[in-house]
């Protein structure tokens, strides 16, 4: 059994040691490596995770191992290299995750293995990361992709989903669904005890299906990862009555038991899990509710696929959060410099040299003047719009203070006069989706984009081109300590701003349903909320509808969030002066415009 370790503590994503012999491994010096991939049939978004299981047969010396996926030098390639390096202790066994971003036109056919800086050989692997995303709103949605655990009945799931008998087809060691079906079903190659403990490892799947017994026996890190995956917009489907959600959730739909004594009774309950769903299927028979399964397929298409396909191109992302409304290229100054050069290098130069009887100097003075003019033009362009990059950071966060967890949907927009020397850096808990120009990366030459997994995920080389606005869609789930403190003194209520930045506007719904509204709360300050506000709460809406589908956190719509149906007793909306929960790939090296909204879920015993 794998020794579990909380994935949030291990920035490298390294799994625990495996006290069993590696099967199907290849040897590279003292290191044995076996490589497997999590099955993905539709490479559209998220990451396809490679799992490298390593063993160091040298009991006296540790070794540094680096795995490098390299694409071809030519062709329609948007990502050239993905790499990661870890250290394998003397006599140790371990597993390493190597996530590869999907939805980019890229292909990898081998994985180079370097041990202590020397290439020892290659592992054979075939990865097709997909075609360029269209970003066309209204295009036909693809079938949701299911990851199915080994204990789930394939026949029962196939009937519930509505696939034909080819709903599962053999593809190598994994059972992969046929395209054109209501859903694509991919069977996990290993038991749930060996599944990755990072939520982003499941980001390519719309639905993960397990049994209640598997939930109980899974390592804590795997349970945590699956629940975070659901909170980021996906679906966790559990077969079995004994499952209980790890946090209190609103019930969206509950079906009574239907069926007969012969076939058995079936029922289902669908909970709201952050931006996603948790569906529990129970009953006394072996069947699974088709009605309940159709509900989660509908959610997957409407709340996740539709959103990502709508905003996957740079033009659509620019309309959501424009980083630059107008390029400030100093063309007038450049033309003036060129006109002065033509005048000085031409008639004035000839006249002066003729008067001094130095006509032969024309052959070195003219090139010098040309070089000086070129430098002046370059300087006018660079300093005319500045050398400092511009960044636009926006997003919305669901801050569940009961669990200390923040789920964020956001966007990064960058405009860089010069390519960032260090590239972009994001945490391991952040899913990064590049919003590419539709024709970018096409042609005969491969793009030099590289992804390096070290202490963070580093996007290097041409992820951000000079003087071209570039956008990245983000999903992240992380542990956070920030919260809004409540202080009660009899009938008086005060709030303490523990969110890290100034709150420009706060709409708070107390546990008894009373609505309060406060403005301008500096970081760390305590402010009395005063009397109840006049806001009447509308009928509740699902968080996924407000935040994902309608994206009411956009600049021109965020003021309407209090009347969107999002607020309920024990929650609040905080309009922040900055964006402390939204990752910034350029970090502090850019001139940044930030804005964000937090939807907070309070704890009953909330105190500062």
Cite the ranges covered by each PLM segment.
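Alpha-helical transmembrane signal-anchor/signal-peptide segments
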Residues: 381-403
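Short alpha-beta junction capping motif
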Residues: 202-246, 272-281
């Amino acid at each position: 059994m794998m020794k579990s370790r909380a994935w949030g503590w291990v920035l490298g994503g390294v799994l625990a040691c495996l006290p069993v012999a590696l099967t199907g491994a290849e040897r590279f010096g003292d290191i044995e490596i076996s490589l497997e991939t999590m099955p993905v049939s539709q490479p559209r978004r998220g990451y396809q995770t490679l799992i490298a299981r390593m063993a160091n047969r040298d009991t006296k010396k540790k070794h540094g191992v680096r795995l490098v996926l390299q694409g071809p030098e030519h062709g329609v390639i948007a990502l050239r290299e993905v790499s990661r390096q870890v250290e394998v202790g003397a006599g140790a066994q371990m597993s390493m995750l190597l996530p590869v971003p999907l939805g980019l036109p890229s292909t990898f056919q081998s994985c180079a293995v370097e041990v202590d800086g020397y290439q020892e050989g290659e592992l054979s692997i075939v990865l097709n990361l997909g075609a360029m995303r269209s970003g066309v709103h209204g295009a036909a949605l693809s079938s949701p992709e299911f990851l199915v655990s080994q204990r789930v009945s394939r026949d029962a799931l196939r009937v519930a989903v509505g696939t034909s008998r080819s709903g599962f087809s053999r593809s190598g060691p994994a059972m992969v669904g046929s395209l054109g079906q209501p859903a694509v079903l991919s069977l996990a190659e290993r038991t749930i005890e060996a599944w990755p403990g990072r939520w982003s490892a499941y980001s390519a799947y719309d639905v993960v299906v397990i049994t209640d017994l598997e939930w109980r026996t899974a390592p804590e890190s795997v349970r945590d990862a699956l629940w975070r995956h659901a909170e980021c917009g996906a679906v966790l489907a559990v077969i079995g009555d004994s499952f209980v959600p790890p946090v209190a959730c609103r019930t969206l739909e509950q079906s009574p038991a239907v069926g007969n004594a012969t076939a058995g009774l079936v029922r289902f309950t669908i909970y709201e899990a952050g931006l996603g769903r948790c569906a529990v299927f129970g009953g006394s028979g072996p069947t699974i509710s088709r009605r309940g399964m159709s509900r989660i397929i509908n959610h997957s298409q409407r709340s996740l696929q539709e959103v990502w396909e709508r905003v996957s191109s740079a033009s659509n992302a620019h309309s959501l959060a424009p980083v630059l409304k107008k390029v400030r290229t100093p063309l007038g100054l450049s033309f003036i410099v060129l006109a002065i050069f033509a005048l000085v290098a031409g008639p004035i130069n000839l006249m002066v040299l003729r008067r001094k009887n130095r006509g032969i100097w024309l052959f070195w003075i003219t090139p010098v003047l040309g070089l000086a003019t070129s430098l002046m033009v370059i300087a006018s362009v660079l300093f005319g719009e500045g050398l400092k990059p511009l960044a636009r950071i926006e997003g919305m966060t669901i801050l569940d203070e009961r669990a200390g967890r923040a789920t964020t949907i956001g966007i990064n927009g960058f405009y860089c006069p010069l390519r960032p020397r260090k590239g972009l850096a994001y945490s391991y808990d952040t899913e990064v989706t590049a919003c590419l120009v539709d024709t970018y990366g096409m042609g005969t030459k491969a793009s030099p984009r590289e992804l390096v997994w070290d202490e963070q995920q580093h996007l290097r080389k041409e992820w951000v081109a000079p003087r071209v606005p570039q956008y990245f869609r983000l999903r992240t789930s992380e542990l956070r300590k920030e919260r809004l403190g409540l202080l009660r003194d009899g009938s008086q209520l005060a709030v303490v701003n523990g969110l890290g930045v100034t709150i420009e506007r706060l709409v708070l719904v107390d546990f008894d349903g009373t609505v309060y509204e406060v403005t301008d709360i500096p970081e760390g300050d305590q402010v009395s909320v005063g009397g109840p506000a006049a806001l009447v709460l509308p009928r509740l809406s699902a968080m996924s509808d407000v935040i994902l589908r309608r994206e009411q956190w956009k600049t021109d719509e965020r003021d309407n969030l209090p009347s969107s149906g999002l607020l309920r007793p024990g929650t609040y909306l905080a309009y922040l002066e900055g964006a402390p929960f939204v990752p910034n790939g350029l970090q502090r090296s850019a001139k940044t415009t930030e804005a964000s909204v937090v939807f907070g879920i309070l704890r009953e015993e909330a105190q500062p």
